[in-house]
Amino acid sequence: MGGGDLNLKKSWHPQTLRNVEKVWKAEQKHEAERKKIEELQRELREERAREEMQRYAEDVGAVKKKEEKLDWMYQGPGGMVNRDEYLLGRPIDKYVFEKMEEREAGCSSETGLLPGSIFAPSGANSLLDMASKIREDPLFIIRKKEEEKKREVLNNPVKMKKIKELLQMSLEKKEKKKKKEKKKKHRKHKHRSSSSGGSSSEDEQSQARSQKKMANSFPVLSKVPGYGLQVRDSDRNRGLQGSLGEQRAIKNNSRSRSSSPPRHASKKSTKEERPRDRRSRSPSRRSRSPRPSKPHTSKVNRKERDSPSPKKEAYQRRHASGYTRKLSAEELERKRQEMMENAKWREEERLNTLKRHAREDEREHRLERLDSRSGKFLHRMKLESASTSSLEDRVKRNIHSLQRTSVALEKNFMRR
């Protein structure tokens, strides 16, 4: 039985995973520190180079020397001497006074005011300084990179082809959009011109549209003439439905035969009347007996054709399937109270559901906290097993630890 290298089980062994990880982390940390130090050194070198270049430019005269507010901290005792103090009788060091005079005497040579200094080649240095400034400008570097990228794109035929295709697609989309807008404008203009021809057909079309919207939005309740009740279309008087459908058909026939409105207006009126005819046909009417006999309908058609009554048409439009009577103030108040009660009930239901979910979440979090504690989960499982097990199970589990008799000692001790 070989246990392998026992040194690998020691905490100090260098080949264990933990020690290898520690070494790797220390190396990474050392490498990061080294990179940071190199970066700081590089920044210091660049800053020193900039300061030297600035100082050189100020010495040559290419750049105006800026007045720093903290120069007095770096000046010697001679820089803080005030000459007016001598006039006021205050003592001034003679050495400092001489130094200041020497500095003033040598100022002309430093600033280039000596005879013949105007012919000194100072322009080249200023040009070099300006060129170095332009090269180090970050905005100039960004512009240069952008120009290089543009040049690469222009020199690459594949990219140029893709760009041309994209431009062509965008132009085609714009042209299609313009064509659609032109067609829409033309259609609107045509519709306005046709609507100006027949004012009566326009009124009927608007009424039909409003009735269609009301019928689609909610189940229609229409008022039966002579009663104050509101009933559904399916429970309405079937004879009234049949008569209304016949009268609409007669009206359509008379309107189609009349030659007063223009051609396109009559087409639109027939198109708008068709959905009204479809709405008037309810399932109860389909299941009823067929229409009255043909002679009777022909008489009615003849009468309607000879003398059309506008009052009857207005009554039919008013009592069509989409018409509802105006509610009184009491009914409006009652509906408002019902809506408020419904909203209150919904708010209570929402709060109850939120509370229930909050209780469930709290119970889950509590169970998770109990399970996450060390030993609590096993303790709970032991309690559950103890509560469900019987006395026989406990005796069988402890059978090997029970005291044996003399008969059991005489038997083979290896057997169980």
From Swiss-Prot:
Cross-link entry Glycyl lysine isopeptide (Lys-Gly) (interchain with G-Cter in SUMO2), positions: 382
GO BP of this protein: mRNA splicing, via spliceosome
Compartment list: Nucleus
Ribosomal protein keyword on record: no
Ranges annotated as biased composition (Basic residues): 175-193, 277-300
Entries under InterPro entries matching the protein: CIR_N_dom, CWC25, CWC25_splicing_factor
UniProt entry keywords in alphabetical sequence: Coiled coil, Isopeptide bond, mRNA processing, mRNA splicing, Nucleus, Phosphoprotein, Spliceosome, Ubl conjugation
Basic and acidic residues biased stretches: 301-316, 327-343
GO cellular component, one term: nuclear speck
Free-text function comment from the UniProt entry: Involved in pre-mRNA splicing as component of the spliceosome.
Official protein name in the record: Pre-mRNA-splicing factor CWC25 homolog
Source species of the chain: Mus musculus (Mouse)
Lineage: Eukaryota, Metazoa, Chordata, Craniata, Vertebrata
